[in-house]
Amino acid sequence: MYSEADRTLWHGRIHDNDNHAHFTNSQLVQVVDAEGELTERFDVGILGYAVDRGVYLNQGRVGTKQGPDAIRTKFGNLPLMHDLSIADFGNVTTEEKFVEDVQHEYAELIDKTNDYAKFHLLIGGGHDISYAHFKGLKALYPEQSIGVINIDAHFDLRDSEYGTSGTGFKQILDEDADAGYLVLGLQEAGNTQHLFEVAEQYDVKYVLAEDIDYDTTDEIIQSFIEQYDIIMLTLCLDVIDSAFAPGVSAPCSFGLTPQQVERLIRAVLSYGKTRHLSIAEMNPEYDIDGRTAKLVGHIMFFAVHRNPSIL
C-alpha cells in the first residue's frame, strides 16, 4: 500500500531562509505523490520501504517498518553542500501475511520514478527490499546484465516457499541466470556451512569483513563491475559493528566501521553504473539516541555528495 510522505518529518535547524549556502536538506525536499502524474525532474529521489514482515518471516527482530521515517528526520537535518533538488516519493507499507505483493508494488514505483531523479535512495525496511529493488531494475533494463553488490554480513541465500528478508538474493539468482552476486563484509560466524555451500553452487563472490582493505577490495570490485551493464548496490546495516549501529535487525559484534562502508559505496558509485542505492534493516525499536538513523543519514549524505551520477 502506497502512502505519500509526511512533510512534518522534514524539519531541522533553520540557519537562513534565503541563502542556499546555509540550507539543510529539509529546506529543499519536495514531497511528491508518486501515484500521481510525474513531471518535474530532481537530482535525488527518496522512496521508502516501510515493511518488516519479511524480517518477521525470517525470524528476525521486527521494527524496521519504522526505519524510513526515522532516517528522514536525520537526513533532513544535514547540510546541503551543493544546490541539489530532492524529491521524497513516499513509502510503501503492507499489512498482508507475505511480502510478494508489496515487493511488486515497490518495484513498479522504482520503475515509474526512475526518470524523475538522477539518483535514488531506497530506504527500508527489511532486506526483502533487495528483491523489489532488483525487480525494479529488471523492468527498467530488461536486456542488460545486472551485477548485484551487497554490503552485508550475511549471504541472504536462504530457501523458502515465500519471500523473506533472508531469501532475496537466491530469488534473484534463480530468476536471472545472467545476474552476478558479490558480497562485501561477510561474517564467517554469521552464515552456516550450508549457506557457504549454496554460495559456491551459485558462484557467489565474497570478501569477508576481516579481509576488507582498500587495494585488494577495490580490485575485486572493479573486476566484478566490468562484467555487467548495470550494478545494483544494496547495503544491509547489520554489516556495521553494533557499537556504531545498534538499531538493526541483527546486530554485529565484529562488523565494519562506518568509514569502511562509505568507502565501499564510493568505490562502487565511481563507475557510473549505479543509479539506485537501497539501505536495509534500520530498526528504530533498538536504536540508541537515534545513533543508527543518524549514521544512515550520513551514509546517504556521502552517497549523494560524492556521486558522479549527480554532480
Curated annotation (Swiss-Prot):
Matches recorded under Pfam families: Arginase
Molecular function GO terms recorded: agmatinase activity; formimidoylglutamase activity; manganese ion binding
Gene3D superfamilies xref list: Ureohydrolase domain
Cofactor binding, note field: Binds 2 manganese ions per subunit.
Top-level enzyme category: hydrolase
Entry-linked CDD domains: Formimidoylglutamase
Cofactor(s) in the UniProt record: Mn(2+)
EC number: 3.5.3.8
Keywords associated with the record: Histidine metabolism, Hydrolase, Manganese, Metal-binding
Protein name as catalogued: Formimidoylglutamase
Pathway(s) where this gene product acts: Amino-acid degradation; L-histidine degradation into L-glutamate; L-glutamate from N-formimidoyl-L-glutamate (hydrolase route): step 1/1
Superkingdom, natural source: Bacteria
Catalytic activities: N-formimidoyl-L-glutamate + H2O = formamide + L-glutamate
Residues that, per the record, bind Mn(2+) 1: H127, D152, D156, C236
UniProt GO BP: L-histidine catabolic process to glutamate and formamide; L-histidine catabolic process to glutamate and formate; putrescine biosynthetic process from arginine, via agmatine
